Amino acid sequence: MTQCPFTPCADGLILAVRLTPRAGRTGLDGVRTEPDGRPILCLRVAAPPVEGAANAALTAFVAKSLGLRKSEVTLVSGETARTKRLHLSGDPQALAARATAWFGGDGPGS
């Protein structure tokens, strides 16, 4: 199985994402391994990459998928790049369980 594309931190998780904007529909494309060996969650959104629309759609989709408020999902890095890092606020263990159930990866350290 694929490793999880997240790292626990004191107040939540950091989630590594590769985003495809302007897709036919918003959805999950699974977990892939980057050339450097790091796992990354591949997502697509219908919104175009204009004036932050794709990033807003990304955070809203992740929040809805994990049962979080939109304010609990923030973009940490990659504002104009396809590869992004999101901070998910909450209990790291509970978030890890929800995230793993959502995309079907292994837990941290597996």
Swiss-Prot record:
It comes from Methylorubrum populi (strain ATCC BAA-705 / NCIMB 13946 / BJ001) (Methylobacterium populi). This is UPF0235 protein Mpop_2087. Belongs to the UPF0235 family. Coiled coil: none annotated. Gene3D superfamilies: YggU-like (3.30.1200.10). Pfam families: DUF167. GO terms for cellular component: cytoplasm. NCBIfam families: DUF167 family protein.
